[in-house]
C-alpha cells in the first residue's frame, strides 16, 4: 500500500467478487475503513474492513441477508459504525452496529416502523450534539426520521419529517433517463 498522502497507485486493484450495486464506505473511531456492498442479485450484504488503520483488508464477511442496496453506514458518537440495510421491496429495515470501534458487529435488530414500507436505503448522519439521525422515504413519498435520544443512547420513535411529499423511486427501479424526459424536435 502506498503511504498516506502519497501518490495514487498506477492501476485499479481487484477488491473481491462482483457487487450488485455501488458499495458504501465509512471510517470508524479506530481509524479503519469499512466497505459494505451487496452481492449480485441482492443475495446478501457483505462488509470488508481494514485489518489495521491505513493497512490491508480483512476478508469479506456477511452483514445481513437479502438487501436492496449496499447498507447505509454512519459512525456514532462512540466511534462505532452503524449499518442500516433494507430488504428488497422495503418491508424490513435492519440495524447492526459495531460493539467497539473497529470491533465485531452486533447481530442487530429490525429497525423499521411496523406496516411502513420504505423505497430506498435510508441516509444517516451524526449531528453536532453526537446524536445519530436516520432519514428514510416511504412508498407514499413521505420522509420519516428516527433520532437517538442522546449520544450512543436509545432511539426515539419514527416521526414525520415535514409534510411535503417527495417522488419515491423504488430501489432497483430504473431511473428516468434524460432522453426519456425530453423529445428532440
Predicted regions and their residues:
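A structural motif
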Residues: 1-185
Amino acid at each position: 500500500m502506498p503511504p498516506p498522502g502519497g501518490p495514487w497507485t498506477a492501476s485499479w486493484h481487484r477488491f473481491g467478487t462482483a457487487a450488485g450495486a455501488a458499495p458504501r464506505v465509512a471510517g470508524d473511531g479506530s481509524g479503519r475503513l469499512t466497505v459494505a456492498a451487496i452481492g449480485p442479485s441482492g443475495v446478501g450484504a457483505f462488509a470488508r474492513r481494514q485489518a489495521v488503520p491505513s493497512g490491508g483488508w480483512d476478508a469479506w464477511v456477511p452483514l445481513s441477508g437479502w438487501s436492496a442496496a449496499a447498507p447505509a453506514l454512519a459512525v456514532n458518537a462512540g466511534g462505532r459504525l452503524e449499518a442500516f440495510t433494507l430488504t428488497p421491496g422495503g418491508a424490513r429495515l435492519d440495524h447492526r452496529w459495531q460493539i467497539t470501534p473497529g470491533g465485531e458487529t452486533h447481530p442487530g435488530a429490525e429497525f423499521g416502523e411496523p406496516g411502513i414500507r420504505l423505497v430506498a436505503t435510508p441516509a444517516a448522519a451524526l449531528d453536532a450534539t453526537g446524536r445519530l439521525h436516520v432519514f428514510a422515504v416511504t412508498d407514499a413519498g413521505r420522509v420519516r426520521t428516527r433520532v437517538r435520544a442522546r449520544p450512543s443512547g436509545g432511539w426515539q420513535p419514527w416521526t414525520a419529517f415535514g409534510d411535503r411529499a417527495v417522488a419515491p423511486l423504488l430501489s432497483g427501479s430504473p431511473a428516468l433517463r434524460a432522453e426519456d424526459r425530453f423529445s428532440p424536435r
